[in-house]
């Protein structure tokens, strides 16, 4: 991956390892979409578009030679720069266990938020429809734990009618889930009751959405396609600091909208 130019950076192997490990730790907790969608790839930096398996016919009916264009989703290329203090990084070699990587950490969070934004809300300029775009798959839900359980049962009933198998996952706004937990009554925890309704699925809380959705995790319905997975490269040196960047190429495809139900509170 020469485009990352890591060998040109004034950083030691230990420093690179610390940077990569810290970024990986944050990505693991902040990439909410990857917790329940299928991840394909990575196919490499040169992978520019993902084929959709269709042809848009553009020739006239009376033409002898018919022709068209293969449909595809172009990959989104993101790049976010940040700077780290070289003296502080050298402290790592001196034995300091907690060097300041706050600039890296903040950039990682913004990149994770961008990827999730595409998954949940789409990106019109790149032809991506996000999960929340399918308003026709919406059901209303009240504000009590009982209302939530009833909405999940209704969602699973719709899945059953459409032939969508499980397991199923509830993706819900973190604050809304906390409020449901505050209002629960009885000796049997709400979390257990929801998990039983989901038939072996799980609950994912996230600040990325305002309401909730129930999705099937049978596989093949929602695809995050990676060209170059999240990587860190070297950009330049600025006196006593080093300028690095995070990059990724990806797109997202909702193959089957019938595998999701939006819950609106």
Curated annotation (Swiss-Prot):
Biotechnology: Foreign proteins can be targeted to ectopic nanocompartments in E.coli upon coexpression with a construct using the 15 C-terminal residues of Flp (AC Q9WZP3), tested with GFP. There are at most 20 GFP per compartment. Empty nanocompartments can be disassembled by extreme pH or by 7 M guanidine hydrochloride (GuHCl); only reassembly from GuHCl-dissociated compartments allows incorporation of targeted cargo.
Location of the region described as Pore-forming loop in the Swiss-Prot/TrEMBL record: 184-189
Enzyme class: hydrolase
Any one GO CC term of the record: encapsulin nanocompartment
Binding residue positions for FMN: 79-81, 87, 90-94, 235
InterPro entries in UniProt: ENCAP (IPR007544), Encapsulin_nc (IPR051429)
Subcellular location(s) of the protein: Encapsulin nanocompartment
Domain of life: Bacteria
Temperature remarks: Optimum temperature for protease activity is 90-93 degrees Celsius.
pH dependence, record text: Optimum pH for protease activity is 7.1. Nanocompartments are stable from pH 4-12, they reversibly disassemble at pH 1 and pH 13.
Enzyme Commission no: 3.4.-.-
GO biological process terms on file: intracellular iron ion homeostasis; iron ion transport; proteolysis
Cofactor: FMN
Family, as annotated: Belongs to the encapsulin family. Family 1 subfamily.
Role noted for this protein: Shell component of a type 1 encapsulin nanocompartment. Assembles into proteinaceous shells 23-24 nm in diameter with 2-2.5 nm thick walls. Cargo protein Flp (ferritin-like protein, probably stores iron) is targeted to the interior via its C-terminal extension; empty intact shells can be isolated in the absence of cargo protein. Fe(2+) may be able to pass though the 5-fold and dimer channels in the protein shell. Protease that exhibits activity toward chymotrypsin and trypsin substrates. Probably does not have antibacterial activity.
Protein's recorded name: Type 1 encapsulin shell protein
The species this protein was found in: Thermotoga maritima (strain ATCC 43589 / DSM 3109 / JCM 10099 / NBRC 100826 / MSB8)
């Amino acid at each position: 991956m020469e485009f990352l130019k890591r060998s040109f950076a004034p950083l030691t192997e230990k420093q690179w390892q610390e940077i990569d490990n810290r970024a990986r730790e944050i990505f693991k907790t902040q990439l909410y979409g990857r917790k329940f969608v299928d991840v394909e790839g990575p196919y490499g930096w040169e992978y520019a578009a993902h084929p959709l398996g269709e042809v848009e016919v553009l020739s006239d009916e009376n033409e002898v030679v018919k022709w068209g264009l293969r449909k595809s989703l172009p990959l989104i290329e993101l790049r976010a720069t940040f700077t780290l203090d070289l003296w502080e990084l050298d402290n790592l070699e001196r034995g300091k266990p907690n060097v300041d990587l706050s600039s890296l950490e903040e950039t990682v969070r913004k990149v994770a938020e961008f990827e999730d934004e595409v998954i949940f809300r789409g990106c019109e300029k790149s032809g991506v429809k996000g999960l929340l775009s399918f308003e026709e798959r919406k059901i209303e839900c009240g504000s009590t734990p009982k209302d939530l359980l009833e909405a999940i049962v209704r969602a699973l009933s719709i899945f059953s009618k459409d032939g969508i198998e499980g397991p199923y996952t509830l993706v819900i706004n973190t604050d809304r889930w906390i409020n449901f937990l505050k209002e629960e009554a009885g000796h049997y925890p709400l979390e257990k009751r929801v998990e039983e309704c989901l038939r072996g699925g799980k609950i994912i809380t996230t600040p990325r959405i305002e309401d909730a959705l129930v999705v099937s995790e049978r596989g093949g319905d929602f695809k995050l396609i990676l060209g170059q997975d999240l990587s860190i490269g070297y950009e330049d040196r600025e006196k006593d600091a080093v300028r690095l960047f995070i990059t990724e190429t990806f797109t997202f495809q909702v193959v089957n909208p019938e595998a999701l139900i939006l819950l609106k509170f």
